[in-house]
């Protein structure tokens, strides 16, 4: 299970410094078409102990760019890379939504030892990590993949199979996730034009939003046999 070891001391739950000062005014408006706001998920490792300190700022910049470019950030309500992306998102007064493996806030914080901070909304799935991963991915219009481990590859695979647009954050030797994903795509013999790569969070979010816009021209329908159909 994840712990708060990946959090900066000032951001550990209960710390007086963990409160953000943004107004939640952007959550209170009467626009009836808010459902059109893109939802971008952030997938990445919950344990950043094997990564350099610079990755924290990279994660925050991903969240900042999601907010600045007008999207809602979605995550697994976890620690590590997604957590720091949520911090960046809230720095720009963006909206941060989380999907928890737990059945409620007490289990989330005390059993799974996951943070509640920097989340505007948390859906408590009660389905554990694997069930949470599926619901998280299928609730997003697109996914950004940062440095990750097994759970990240599972989320990537679900999105890839469902043809959900993917933005892969490229690293210069800080992690190998992008290289591994490139290898998986190459050997899978299943081309997918809904995957983009970039080492710059601002450009990556912009590219992903373009893919999401194009993807919305088609309606996805899930059949009982789990096959995915596309209707113009």
Show where each model-derived region lies.
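C-terminal amphipathic helix plus adjacent low-complexity
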Residues: 210-232
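Positively charged, low-complexity intrinsically disordered leader regions
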Residues: 22-55
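Acidic/glycine-enriched connector segments
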Residues: 34-37, 48, 56-64, 68, ...
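Structural loop-to-beta junction motif characteristic of Rossmann-like glycosyltransferase folds
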Residues: 144, 163-166
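Short acidic-hydrophobic, aromatic-tinged amphipathic segments that line or gate anion-handling sites
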Residues: 122-127, 192-204
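Nucleotide-sugar donor-binding patch of glycosyltransferase catalytic domains
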Residues: 165-195
